[in-house]
Amino acid sequence: FTANKPQIRRIIARRISKKERFNSVAYFRAHAEEIGRRLASDLREGTWRPKPCREKLIFDDLRDKWRHLKVPCLYDQCAHHAIMRQTIPDIMARKYYYDCGSVPKAGQSRAVDILRRKLKKKKPFKYALSMDVHHFFESLQAYVVIRALRKIYKDRRFLALHEIVLEGMGGVLAIGFYPSPWYANLVLGFLIDRF
């Protein structure tokens, strides 16, 4: 793991800029240097352990269903961002182009653009299929994600950090954790490669 203190400080600054209304933000702002130093050393030495996360039930008006969120504490969110900062380029390199999941530059807007382009061709297609895996995050076990990560990384300490993140989620991908959509897209990419 190679995140240095300036990178960690930038991650902390970004995280607290989006969460002005929480009490822990004032503490993080006042002690950003110390927290950044501690987080960098915890991640480098492998001593970081996530705290129990807050659980929340919200109603998603768009999908007309209830969602069970797990919200990690701010320190753990910064750790997730630091770990994923080094993982995301490798996931994006292996990502299936037509997988329009919830990651930047690959959401609904890309799906609509793809469909528009396909429909403009001279021979329009007769059928189209849009699929959504029912409760995909909750059904994706941690060992499957670790198996996919082992195909990319050989560094045991870095894999151990990912295992710790997955343990903090509760053994399955949790809605509300920053790494969850990235892990889901990684596993989908490997599944598509197999078939």
Protein language model features and the residues they cover:
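Non-catalytic, well-ordered alpha-helical scaffold segments
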Residues: P6, E33, R37, D76-H81, ...
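Conserved pre-motif C helix in the palm subdomain of viral-like polymerases
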Residues: K65-Y96, F137, G170-F195
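Non-catalytic, polymerase-adjacent accessory regions of viral genome-replication enzymes
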Residues: F1-D42
